[in-house]
Structures are given as C-alpha cells and as structure tokens.
Design a protein with these regions (language model features):
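Aromatic-lined substrate-binding rim segments of carbohydrate-active enzymes
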Residues: 100-185, 256-275
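Active-site groove signature of glycoside hydrolases
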Residues: 182-247
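Bacterial Sec-dependent N-terminal signal peptides
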Residues: 2-3, 21-55
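Extracellular/luminal regions of secreted and cell-surface proteins that mediate adhesion/ECM remodeling
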Residues: 412-549
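Catalytic cores of secreted or luminal carbohydrate-active enzymes
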Residues: 368-425
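Aromatic- and acidic-residue-enriched segments that line the glycan-binding/catalytic groove
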Residues: 164-188, 238-250, 292-299
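N-terminal secretory signal peptides that target proteins for export/translocation
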Residues: 1-11
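Catalytic-core regions of glycoside hydrolase
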Residues: 48-95, 149, 228-235, 241-391
C-alpha cells in the first residue's frame, strides 16, 4: 500500500468551501432524520461544474448505528476487590433490560477499573497485571482484562490511595512500613490507615507504581483513559489531608499546589499516548469536604494548570444537585469543545435509597434523567454504568430497566458522530498529475472528537483511499493533513479542498473510499463514521469507481 502524505506531496488550497458548497447545493442531501448510510455510490453521482473532471457524491448519516470510537460511549465499571462477582462477564453478557436480555458490551466499549492501589501493587515491585502476581485481586484483574479483550473493549483506570470510608488499607502496607507518614480513621469496627500525599516516602512509591503501570499501559490500543490523581475521599480529589497542614499547622495552598503539580506532572509525562483526566469541582485538592455554594478561589487556576499539561476533565457526581451545581456548570461551559468530558453519576441506589427525594427526584428513573440532562448540557463524551455486586440494585441495572431509552439515546446522539455528507472526487486520475478533492464534514453528536489533546496530536486524519475492487483493501492512501476533527461540532459543517499529486498508481480501476485513519497504525481506520451502507469490513466508506491511467 502506497501512502501519499499531504505534507510531503500536496499543495494546499485553504478554503472555507464556498465554491464547493455552491456546486453541491443543487444536489439533494440527507436531513437530520436520515436513518441509512446510503446515497453514496455511482447512481448518486452529479458532475461537479466547479472542479473539472470531478463528480460529487452525497452521503447520508445513519442515526441508529452504535459506534465504538475512542473516548466515546458508555463505560462499564468493575473493581478487583473481594466484591467482584465471579460471574461478572456472564452477568453482563446476559443482562436483563426493559426490552429483554442484552449484552452490555454492545453498548459499552470501555471497562473502567477503579480500585485500591494496594490491590494492584500488593508487594513492592509486584504488580497485579504481571504473571508473577497471583493474589485473588490479580486473578480478577487478569480475568477482567482478558474478558475486555474478547469483547473489543478498552480499559480505563483510577487508583484510590485514601482508606477513609473503606474496610481495609487502600495504600500498600509496605509504604507504611517504609516510614510514610499517615493517619488512622475508623470505618465501622475497622481501623484503617491513609498516607499524607505530601509525604516524600509515599510519593516515591506511588511514582514507582505509576511508572510501572505506564510501561505496560501507555498504549491506546489497550487503554481508553487514566484518571490522573486518585487522592482524597473516594479518589475524587476533595477532603485531602496534608502532613504539612494537619500536623505542622502550615498554610494549605503551598502544599496543596506542590502536590497537585507533582502528581499532574507525573501522569502527563508517563501517559503521553493515553488521555489522562482530572476531576473538576469547586474544592479540588482542598481539605474541605464541601461548603454549600461557596467555592475555593484557586481551584479553577489549578485545574487550568493540569489542562495546560494535557489533562482532560471528569466529574463524579452528575445528578447530585448539591455537588453538581452552578459552579460546576459554569466551569465546564468554559471548556466546551476544548477538552473532552467524562461523567459519572453521584447517586447510588443501593446505599442512598430515598435520599434522592432531597434533590427533588421521585424515583431512580428521574435520577437517571437528571444525570442524562446534566451530561448533555456538559457535552460529555462518555457516561457511566457503575458496578454493584448485587447488580439488580445497581446503577447499570437501573439504566437498562428504568431508563433504557436514555442508554440508546446516548449511543445515537451523544459523544461524537462524524461523517462527510458531500465529497467531490475525480473520475479519472493520471500519474504525475494533480487532483483536487473537496469534502465537507459534520458531527451530529453533542460531544466532540478531541484530536486537539496532546496524546492524539496528528493521530487521526482524514484520508482518501483507492481500494482494490476485488477485495476492498486499500492500495493507495492520500492523507489530508489539514482537517482537524476537533473542529467539527454539532450544527456547523466544515468544508475543505485538498490538492495532491498522484504518483506510482498502477493503471486500472479502483474504488474511491474515505475514512478517518490512525496515522500511528499505518493508516488503518481509527474512527468509524456514522454511516452504514457501503462500508468495508475495515471501516472504509466506499464512494464510486475511478480509473487510473
């Protein structure tokens, strides 16, 4: 397969697509309600009067197809502690819903593993994902990873170090034994220990763990994202206690900022290929648990520092009106289409029960609707299906039985849904000659495709391929380096003109095709388009036949 990169061979005509748009305005195009990906093919060709030798093909979006694309869709939760069901995959492959039994991985394409650092790192230098570790937690982890692989799901991680509200130590005991400073708290009848995150011994061992993790999991083929902190209560970066503050009485901000800088530097440096996320809420990194509508004046600045390092944003209490309110809404609105957002609901059916009534919810169907509405307003890319060992009382069961229509609605309206509605291509090509391709792109999802984050820099690009007419495999690929999918947002189409030279193409007939390729994987399709008909098994959208001379 020959590859022609725009920055090597092509000449760019920077255009807002005015001529192209005028030419194709005479061609019927799909409306927002189009269901099928048809309309592309030889029968739908119209001569392009603005580009001699070109024909225009129109493409209709498909609103029903569920796309499993990077940083998009539903996230299925799991852990590797004792609470994990031994029939996890069997349960979720045969999951009851309001419309019958479903397979959850048909809807979710990410398995999110949130758990105790101690479970992932039981002894110094020993890690649960390696073959030399055979603890019960390690066996569960390997089972989950293998099951995710079989279902074409990627992984995501959060590692919690704080043991408050837990029934065992979430930080490995060898860290305490090495002399790390910490504090004890009581959970029921159990006394647990948590480290101070400003302690240098803690930081030494934590950094060693994260670097070991990145060595095996800084891989976008395996991992969807990593939460780059995990401090404070529940790993959500609030209610954080510091040694310098709590024991020595020093001001909080200098220590808090130093720890924040250290941990965000660490994750952003070692995970340079996988997106990393930080929580957004009004008390980031403070010792405060909450304080009504008040907020910390340094929080927004600190989160901005993390984003500048390449962090994206998540929040873990969507739908809880105390913890996701005016400050959070206003904050995330400033980052709309600048960084991707991941949501997690806050209400837990099994433990919160009727407390939801304080937020004005009559039942958990209304809770799910409240979470969904907030997620849509925040333009999130990913939503949560949380785990409970008693899954019939869990959030995933609630979504699939009390709000299944919202599960499906997010699949077809949320995240990003990209497709080119109109493309002008030459009907014949000749070696040594320039060709001109005009193309227009849309996004009908409420989120965006974050090709602007540093982990994805120059990774996903629009490409046009000449397919072998016998087997649909690409013989020649022309990569247009100009378009950025992050610019495509709902309600605004983007038009481009791509001029390139044809070199080394064998004479004969080919099929024009278009796709968004992963340049790090020899231009395999990296992002699937929101179309259905005329798509090859590899994900290329076939357009029409072309003759090479």
């Amino acid at each position: 397969m020959k590859i022609n990169f725009q920055n090597m061979y092509s000449l760019r005509k920077i255009s807002c697509g005015l001529i192209f748009s005028m030419a194709i305005s005479l061609v019927a195009c799909g409306s927002d309600n189009d269901e099928e990906g048809g309309g592309n093919g030889d029968d739908g060709l119209v001569e392009d009067t603005s580009i001699p030798g070109n024909s225009i093909v129109t493409v209709k979006q498909n609103r029903n197809i569920i796309l499993h694309n990077p940083l998009s869709g539903w996230v299925l939760y799991a852990g590797i502690g004792d609470g994990l069901s031994s029939t996890f995959w069997q349960d979720y492959d045969n999951f009851p819903s309001s419309e019958g039994t479903v397979k959850v991985s048909d809807y979710a394409n990410t398995l999110y593993l949130r758990g105790a650092w101690a479970d992932f790192n039981p002894e110094e230098g020993k890690y649960a994902w390696n073959s030399d570790c055979d603890t019960p937690s390690a066996k569960r982890l390997k089972m989950l990873i293998e099951g995710a692989k079989q279902r074409n799901m990627k992984l995501a991680f959060t590692f919690v170090v704080d043991s408050r509200d837990k029934h065992y130590n979430f930080t490995p005991n060898f860290v305490k034994e090495a002399g790390a400073k910490g504090y004890e708290t009581q959970t029921g009848s159990v006394k647990v220990w948590s480290p101070y995150p400003d302690d240098p011994i803690f930081q030494k061992y934590y950094e060693k763990f994260i670097r070991a993790l990145a060595k095996d999991f800084n891989d976008p083929d395996k991992v969807q994202f990593v939460s780059g902190s995990g401090f404070g209560k529940w790993g959500e970066y609030h209610s954080v206690w510091y040694y310098q503050v709590r024991e020595l009485g020093k001001p909080e901000l200098p220590t808090r900022e130093a720890v924040f800088d250290w941990v965000t530097d660490l994750y952003s440096q070692v995970f340079d290929k996988v997106p990393v996320f930080v929580n957004y809420h009004r008390w980031i990194g403070t010792s405060k648990e909450w304080d009504g509508n008040n907020y910390d004046k340094d929080t927004e600045r600190l989160i901005g520092k993390a984003v500048a390092k390449g962090y994206s944003l998540r929040h873990d209490a969507f739908g809880m009106k105390t913890y996701y309110s005016t400050w959070e809404r206003n904050f995330i609105a400033k980052w709309k289409y600048l960084v991707p957002v991941v949501m997690e609901g806050g209400w837990v059916k099994n433990s919160h029960g009727n407390s939801i009534q304080g937020d004005g919810y009559a039942n958990y169907a209304e809770v799910r609707q409240g979470e969904f509405d907030e997620a849509k307003t925040a333009c999130v890319n990913m939503m949560d299906l949380r785990y409970n060992s008693d899954f019939r009382n869990g959030e995933t069961y609630s979504w699939f039985n009390e709000a299944f229509q919202l599960v499906k609605q997010f699949c077809t309206e949320g995240s990003y849904r990209l497709f080119p509605d109109r493309i002008s291509l030459p009907t014949t090509i000749s070696n040594g000659k320039q060709i001109e391709i005009a193309h227009r792109w849309n996004n009908f999802g409420w989120g965006y495709c974050p090709t602007n984050i540093p982990q994805w820099k120059n990774k996903y690009k629009v490409a046009f391929a000449l397919l072998d007419t016998k087997n649909d495999k690409p013989k020649y690929v022309f990569v247009d380096g100009e378009p950025e999918a992050c610019d495509w947002v709902k309600g605004t189409a983007k038009s481009y003109t791509f001029t390139t030279r044809v070199e080394g193409v064998g004479a004969g007939k080919y099929m024009w095709a278009v796709g968004i390729v992963d340049t790090a994987k020899q231009n395999e399709i990296g992002i699937h388009l929101a179309v259905k008909n005329n798509v090859t098994s590899a994900g290329w959208l076939k357009l029409f036949e072309v003759t090479a001379r």
